[in-house]
Amino acid sequence: MAKEPRSLQGKVVAITGGARGIGKATAKALAREGAVIAIGDLDAELARATASELGEGSVGLELDVTRRDSFENFLDQVSERLGPLDVIINNAGIMPIGPFAEEDDATAKRMIDINLHGVITGTKLAIPPMVQRRTGHIVNIASQAGKAGVPGGATYCATKHAVVGLSEAVRAELRGTGVEVSVVMPAVVNTELGSGLPDTPGVKKLEPEDVANEIVNALKFPKFDVWVPRSSAAISTVMQLLPRRGREAIGRLLNVDKVLAEPDKGARAAYEERAARSEPGLEPGEGESGSGKKRTKSAAPR
């Protein structure tokens, strides 16, 4: 007998980095299901504009996922304006790429602060009220790079491996509480973050809506591992049965080793510049970081 899908009508959903890309597509998909959406983004103006596209009731709010006080304020506003939080989607992330030995420390810190610490903070803050109500769903956006190491994206892969491990551990801790956890692992997506990345033979770039639809499905039919496309799960299982040399040889045959290592730099230039302005670690009112970069209102994009 087929399982009945859970209704998302009236559910309060908070999406970090939700003003663009996967976050925006997911917000639209959930709004069509009747959910009420809070868009959190460092670009507050764009967050409000995105929320206005979703219809009455949804809100756009400023959020810097690298600051706990900003995250607390965001979730407090969500509860005050929309009601108790039912779902949090930790989506904010950046992906500057290049040879690991040439990566400066500020870039590495930025990725870790946004991609990992942002997920940790969002998950920690969401758990207590969800456990108290014995209901809720935490969705952490990782990547298929969280299951492998890809040249050109060493630190990015490290953050996504961490998100997968974090999600597995938290899921085990929350067993029996009524709170669900999902980790989403997309292949390359046709967003600004994926701009300039080469195609691999037989693998088509995903659209943000493809990922959004799988997130909606994971909320309606709760599951932990959310592979996008779904066929990736079987491919990953088969690959893990092969010895390392075999896996690496197949990866080279499919040009997987070139996806992040050999991008079209001209096509990625605008994204890389904007990602570099997603400056974490500044105290409120502070205009300069230790690297001398000025803080600007730039979302953590996907």
Q: What is each PLM-predicted segment?
A:
Residues 56, 77-88, 96:
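A glycine-rich helix->loop->beta "capping" turn
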Residues 99-100, 104-112:
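Substrate-binding pocket helix/loop in short-chain dehydrogenase/reductase
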Residues 123, 159:
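Active-site helix of classical SDR
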Residues 143:
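Residue(s) in the substrate-gating loop at a strand-loop-helix junction
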Residues 183, 199-236:
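C-terminal helical subdomain
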